[in-house]
Amino acid sequence: MYTKWNHKIVLFVTIIAVSTLAVSAQMKVWSVNSESRLTIITDKAVERQSFPIDFKLFDLNIDPLREQLFSVVDQNARQRPTVIQLPNANGDIEYFEVYEDSNFEPDLQAQFPEIRAFSGRGLTDKYATLKLSISPQGIQTMVFRTDTDNEFMEPYSQDHNTYAVYKTHRDKGALPWACSTEDRGLLFDTKSKARSLAPESSTGEVRTVRLAQSCNGEYANFFLAHSAADVALVLAAFNATITRVNGVNEKDLAIHFNLIAGTTAVIYYDPLTDPYTTLSSWNAQEQAVMNSNIGAANYDIGHMFGASGGGGNAGCIGCVCNDANKGSGITSPADAIPMGDNFDIDYVVHEMGHQLGANHSFSWSNEGSGVNMEVGSGITIMGYAGITSQDVAPHSIDTFHAGNISQIQANLASKACPVTTVMTANHPPVLVAVPGATIPISTPFALTGSATDPEGDPLTYQWEQVDQTTTSGNASVASPTKATGPNWLSFLPTASPTRTFPILPTILSGLFVTPTLPGGDAIANIEALSSVSRTLNFRLTVRDNHPYVAGSTTGQTQFSNTIVTVTSAAGPFKVTSPNTGVTWNGNSVHNVTWDVNGTTANGVNVANVKISYSSDGGQTFPTVIKASTPNDGSEAILVPSVNSATARIKVEAIGNIFFDISDANFTTTNAPVRSRADFDGDGKTDVSVYRPSNSTFFLIMTTNGFGGMAFGNPGDVSVAGDFDNDGKTDIAVYKPGASASFSVFKSSNSTIANTSLGTTGDIPVVGDYDGDGLSDVAVYRASNNSWNVIKSGGGTSNTVFGSPGDLPVVGDFDGDGKTDLAVYRNGTWLILQSSSPVNPLVTNWGLAGDLVAPADYDGDGKDDLCVYRPSNGVWYIVNSGGGYAFYQYGLSGDVPIPGDYDGDGKDDIGVYRNGIWYIYESTSGVAIFNFGLNTDVPIARQYQP
């Protein structure tokens, strides 16, 4: 596999290189059309009611495109692809790797070599898959997208030189169309199979189904075909429609329709003499035409296209390969325009889906088929989106419902007629089974799958409810009190394996019910969290989106079922605070609260929860505040230091699937920028000294000027820090002795706080050990190498770290906002990082006799290792962001005083020499201040005994 994969990569790169050169050497294929749309004579298909309002226009130079495409047909079809460019609905050009995907049996293809079909995979967008048809009349395309709308392209101008590219927004409601296929007389027991929904995957085979396609005279005339001499015009139209039909079938079902050569015998050109009379008679008339003109042994499925009448009828369900009625399916639009995306997908794929074995999937009418599993009108191919009184949307999506896929798979498994080709180049995805869960009522939840693909194809995931309805009409829509049947609409596959229930906008609005999609009926709610006990059955469909290649390979699917049990004995589980537009300052402590409501028992049994933070209004939750905390309804958290007016909190069950998100945005702010010895809170280190002889602090503050304050007693040790989280350094001292203590003068309220901690010989090591933005009082006890901390947020810690003779060092070396435990041992640093407190980080940096001066010199939020060597006045720095720095700045006897004196977020080097400050600011160079006595202690200097 490794060698094969690398061969693919080499081949792929070669193809890209060769094709790119070929494209650049040719005339430009696509150009933006700059004409006024009012001046363009449009193709008659543009007149259809479902033609989109929003689209992009491009002019096509078709000859070089045709040359590229035809380089990989016939004998080259399986050997190599080509690379082409196509415009998208955003107005950009994309690259596709393209293979031939003929819809004609070889004899028919040989007769009409100018009519071709191709499949492709996106190179610009790896999730994109392409279906393209080409003929002398031009091209049509369909691009399947992921996490955005599918796209179509078709001729816009009458001369077919200008093309419209648009996103799928089909509106069937304006057209009086209905499928009249009835559920009676099934040729295969689709009901019992649908109810079981046993986990199945694609079989690793391509099924090629022989299609006999007929049409009446009105259809042929629409495409300007009036006699057998014009047969190519009709075949080109068939080809365009079947290309799109195959796009859906190949992706979901691994089925490919091939038009048989005998199709030309059932194409009719004169409406007055063709065998088709009234719409209600077409099914039987078509079957007779197929039997007499083609013969039952020569085709597997037969279908007929009309141009008007507004209806479709498969004539049967699951009758493919059954001689009695396999040739009785019909499709005819109401607007006399039998082409375009709505005709191809909403009508033709729907009716052929019946013939393959699929029933209707809607629940507005309960047909009792076992697959009435969609809310209201339904939205997948076998639904009725846009044509009921319970429309969940005005148009369908381009996938089969999981229940219908299961029906068709089971039906074809019992049939011998499709030609099956075992694939060696593609295999079904490998899917991990998803366990079930019991959840509380009225509480959001999420289902997550996990799958891999043997060939590395880009996988997509689709979660769907698979409960048969027991209601109909207005009772078929989603409702919190609905105890059975569908409550969750199907959505298009996504690249994410997770689906949240309900959709995120509903959750963020604090609602339990998702209203109808734009254009749907007001009554047709599409999602509802259950407020009653019930069972929900879900199926995950994973698609590998592999393109069809010349009958040898196509897309594969894999499935997993799971059961979610909703119990009214618990819930709702709900975040209660923050739930309004409050403001929480970064690095402050606040309580997150939630209603537990019986979720620790009652079969839900969630003992712990995870708390996460979002700064983008709940779209993502990248910040985990508490990885695990008891499910007790309240937790004090440290607010992330992030500026956001759209913050949200998420509390989610551990070991279960339910969660809740706070209902309203709230505001968080950045924690104040903390520079050492910043007494006025302006983000700059202030020139300041402590005079031990009289316990007086002298300050030159950059914004408030000179200040002084006597605090403490002679012999006390300065231990300045921000003890009240106001962004300003507080005056504080450590009183050594047998009953040592700390005394703090808080700048926020001018109060004094005294804390007893320490004994003779202890070294004060003030720092923010719990990361709450407040300095904690702490001592290092050299007698037993223990760090003793009283945390501002509550609690104490006692950690043994170090050896006799070590020098304790204070710093945040991993940038997590918490002070790490660190010691310096004769040139060796040992750091126990708070983010990884298992094995200490050991680094040799320095010599015995060096003075440690850790600080954030590169401004990355992490303190850097640094020593100042008195013997030569050199600073030796290891930047945490990478690299080293060396500075000759100082003399023997100088005291290193690093700090951010210019407020640029980077600590500057500096020395204190007999009352004179020599600072080398990173923004403006040398600054010298005469302030203090030679016996004073610069407060910027970390205390060292």
Locations of regions flagged by a protein language model:
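Trp/Gly-enriched beta-strand/coil motifs that build multi-repeat beta-propeller-like domains
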Residues: 671-945
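Extracellular acidic, Ser/Thr/Pro-rich low-complexity tracts
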Residues: 450-455, 467, 544, 595-602
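Proline/serine/threonine-rich low-complexity linkers at boundaries of modular beta-sandwich domains
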Residues: 412-430, 564-572
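Exoplasmic/lumenal beta-rich domain surfaces
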Residues: 258, 462-532, 603, 610-612, ...
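Propeptide (latency) domains of metzincin metalloproteases
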Residues: 27-217, 256
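Fold-level signature of zinc-dependent metallopeptidase catalytic domains
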Residues: 27-40, 162-320
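The catalytic-center signature of Zn2+-dependent metalloproteases
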Residues: 260-282, 322-398, 464, 468-479
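Proline-centered linker/hinge motifs at extracellular inter-domain junctions
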Residues: 426-430, 434-435, 459, 540, ...
